[in-house]
């Protein structure tokens, strides 16, 4: 399990040896993976090395600092390098936030999604903040993901892998290193773990001590998530209690109550048949964490050698991904990521060349291990129908196994007449429809969805059944970065996806 694990092992030791060793600045041999990964009847993973594409960046020896020899983008310029090194040295002595075994478990689950046997639900804030850090916010986002998980599992009749953009999603890439207002030019806001969002010189100076605060907030967030996941809150018997107050009297709330009632009836049948509903699988849930691998000094400081496998894991999260702006084949971020054993995501827009994607996957997953690579597409509905088929064919032609996931958020950001950034629910849904259509056309598997969302009753994305208009945006617009789906919109989207998963299972009777 992931967040159902406790702080003690069965043998009673305080912490597992795995992932507790401090970083060693030495060369790491290429990892050797031995896998007996389960497959379905349709697809058998190749385990031999792909020789069709070989890229020079992966031929050099990897170590924890080899990324520093590569071109680095989107990294802040800290004015006090001595202070920076002091903070990083301190962070490198701190306990890991997650354990290597949990990351391996997630990789196995994602391998199932790559073969069409599971579905990834990845969601959370665009960017976590120090100001909005509270137990209620964490609980509400976790709760709506539980609801969405039930809806998707019921529709798809397959396991749902729940991964939060939580407990570490602070840093944000910027299109411009500087921001200008009224003739004043200051460094751009890069996330609370780098600098402050207030538009003044002091706030915008990168402060390395913010990394320590981000670490402690991530630890606290994960601690609460572990408690929710294993302490009874996530038990299926509570399926009727997960509705948020503001979604209760809505169409989505009504649909969810109907589904929850059906789940209750099924559990009642299980009890009557003598099957226990008190089993761990019914009273707990697996929940993993993820964030963009952007602030490399922080990621390096939290990377540990796993004593059970000898591999290096970035113990800041179970899964991390490389963004559109930092996925250069010869870049620092790709160099860092190729040496760690976590499951990895690759954000892909309509600009991605199919051959480049094949090369990037080969650098990051030379052993072609299922679950290692998740390709997260973000390109808008029209581009999705044109570009995605070529990417799928190129990856399949190279014999590579990946989990295909749709991020319908980032390709649909627009500016409202009032000047606020927003996203249209109809556009988000259209991109998801295109994603499923293309995979149906290509005979590949739609493996998951990646959403920027919150459990709060915000008004940041327009549309949905409880229609939010441009005029409504300013009433509860709280995001520090990009607009997020609120709980009602997220649940509505989950029902639409569930119907499409059901269509794949039963035939073309439903439409997204």
Swiss-Prot record:
Q: Which keywords appear in this protein's UniProt record, sorted alphabetically?
A: Amino-acid biosynthesis, Aromatic amino acid biosynthesis, Chloroplast, Manganese, Metal-binding, Plastid, Transferase, Transit peptide
Return the EC number.
2.5.1.54
GO BP: amino acid biosynthetic process; aromatic amino acid family biosynthetic process; chorismate biosynthetic process
Give the required cofactors: Mn(2+)
Q: Name one GO molecular function term.
A: metal ion binding
Q: Which residues are noted in the entry as Mn(2+)-binding?
A: 126, 410, 452, 482
Cofactor info, note text: Binds 1 divalent metal cation per subunit that could be manganese.
Return the annotated region ranges for Disordered. Answer: 37-57
Q: Which compartments is it annotated to reside in? A: Plastid, Chloroplast
Looking up Pfam families in the UniProt record yields:
DAHP_synth_2
Gene Ontology cellular component list: chloroplast
Q: In which tissues is it expressed?
A: Mostly expressed in leaves and stems, and, to a lower extent, in roots, stigmas, anthers, petal tubes, petal limbs and sepals.
Transferase is among the record's keywords: yes
**Which Gene3D superfamilies does this entry report, sorted A to Z?**
Aldolase class I
Return the SUPFAM superfamilies for the record: Aldolase (SSF51569)
User: Null mutant: what phenotype?
Assistant: Normal floral volatile benzenoids and phenylpropanoids (FVBP) emission.
PANTHER family linked to this entry:
PHOSPHO-2-DEHYDRO-3-DEOXYHEPTONATE ALDOLASE 1, 2, PHOSPHO-2-DEHYDRO-3-DEOXYHEPTONATE ALDOLASE 2, CHLOROPLASTIC
Its family? Belongs to the class-II DAHP synthase family.
Its quaternary organisation is: Homodimer.
Protein name (record): Phospho-2-dehydro-3-deoxyheptonate aldolase 2, chloroplastic
Which organism encodes this protein?
A: Petunia hybrida
């Amino acid at each position: 399990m992931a967040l159902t694990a406790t702080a003690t092992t069965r043998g009673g030791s305080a912490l597992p040896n795995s992932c507790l060793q401090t970083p060693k600045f030495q060369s790491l041999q290429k990892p050797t993976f031995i896998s007996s990964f389960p497959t379905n009847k349709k697809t058998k993973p190749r385990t031999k090395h792909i020789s069709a594409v070989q890229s020079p960046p992966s031929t050099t020896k990897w170590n924890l600092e080899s990324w520093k020899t590569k071109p680095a983008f989107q990294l802040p310029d800290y004015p006090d390098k001595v202070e920076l090194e002091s903070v990083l040295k301190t962070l490198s002595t701190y306990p890991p936030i997650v354990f290597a075994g949990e990351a391996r478990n997630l990789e196995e689950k994602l391998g199932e999604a790559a073969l069409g046997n599971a579905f990834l639900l990845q969601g959370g804030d665009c960017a976590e903040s120090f100001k909005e850090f509270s137990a209620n916010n964490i609980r509400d986002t976790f709760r709506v993901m539980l609801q969405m998980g039930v809806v998707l599992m019921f529709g798809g009749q397959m396991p749902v892998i729940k991964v939060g953009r939580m407990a570490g999603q602070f840093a944000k890439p910027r299109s411009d290193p500087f921001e200008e207002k009224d003739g004043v030019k200051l460094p751009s806001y890069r996330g609370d773990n780098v600098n402050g969002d207030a538009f003044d010189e002091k706030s915008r100076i990168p402060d390395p001590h913010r990394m320590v605060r981000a670490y402690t907030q991530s630890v606290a967030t994960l601690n609460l998530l572990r408690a929710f996941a294993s302490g009874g809150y996530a038990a299926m018997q509570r399926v009727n209690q997960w509705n948020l107050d503001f979604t209760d009297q809505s169409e989505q709330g009504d649909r969810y109550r109907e589904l929850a009632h059906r789940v209750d009836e099924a559990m009642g049948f299980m009890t009557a048949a003598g099957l226990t509903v008190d089993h761990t699988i019914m009273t707990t849930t697996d929940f993993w964490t993820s964030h963009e691998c952007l602030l490399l000094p922080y990621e390096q400081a939290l990377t540990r050698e796993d004593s059970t496998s000898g591999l290096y894991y970035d113990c800041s999260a179970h899964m991390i991904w490389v963004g559109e702006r930092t996925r250069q084949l010869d870049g620092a971020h790709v160099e860092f990521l190729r040496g760690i054993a976590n499951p990895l995501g690759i954000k892909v827009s309509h600009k991605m060349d199919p051959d480049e994607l094949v090369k990037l996957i080969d650098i990051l997953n030379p052993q072609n291990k299922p679950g290692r690579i998740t390709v997260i597409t973000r390109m808008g509905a029209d581009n999705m129908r044109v570009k995605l088929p070529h990417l799928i064919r190129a990856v399949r032609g190279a014999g590579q196994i990946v989990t295909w996931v749709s991020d319908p958020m980032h390709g649909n950001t627009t500016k409202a007449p009032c000047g606020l950034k927003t996203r249209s629910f109809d556009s988000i849904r259209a991109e998801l429809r295109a994603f499923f259509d293309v995979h149906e056309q290509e005979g590949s598997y739609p493996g998951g969805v990646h959403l920027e969302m919150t459990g709060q009753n915000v008004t940041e994305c327009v549309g949905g059944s409880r229609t939010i208009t441009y005029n409504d945006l300013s009433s509860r617009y709280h995001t520090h970065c990009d607009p997020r789906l609120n709980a009602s919109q997220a649940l509505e989207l989950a029902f639409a996806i569930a119907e499409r998963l059901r269509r794949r299972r039963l035939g073309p009777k439903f439409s997204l």
